[in-house]
Each structure stands twice: as C-alpha cells, then as structure tokens.
Amino acid sequence: MPITFHIPGGLREFTGGRSTVEIDPSPTTLADALAALWTLYPGVRDRIATEQGQVREHINIFIGVENVRYTGGLASPVAAGVEISIVPAVSGGH
C-alpha cells in the first residue's frame, strides 16, 4: 500500500502541479520516504532540506497528525498507507 505526500501550493511547481504524490513501495522511515520523493521530484529537496540533509526550520512535516519534530525527525517510522503532509510555516503581522 503506497504512502501519500500532500504537497503545499508553493512546491507544486516542482511536482508538475500535483497536490499529492504517491510513493510505492512504502518506505519504513521518513528519510526513506523523502528520498523517494526527491528521486521523483528533485526540485523539492532544496526547499525542504538543508545542505546537511535536515528538515528546514520553517518546514513542518506531519505523518498523519503527528509533527515529526516530536516523533523522531527523519528516523520517524512510516507505515504503509500513511499520509505525510509538508507544511511551510506561515507568519505575518501588521
């Protein structure tokens, strides 16, 4: 069963306009899932990860409803059929 990435509007130019991307076969960690996403859409990588391979501070990634910052980061387990959401931070003011 594939996993599904939900792609935010700002990154869809790198996925051919796709709002969702399915990865199959299912990877076992977030790092593996992201590597599979980057193989399909290499332009996404620099927007999500630093040169050291870490998730950028202004990017939140959720596996289901859990923010990976609190579940093990790139080592977070990924189950078959799960949905992964990439959510850039939004800020504003007056």
PLM features: what roles do these ranges have?
Residues 1-94:
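Ubiquitin-like/PB1-type beta-grasp interaction modules and other compact soluble beta-rich domains
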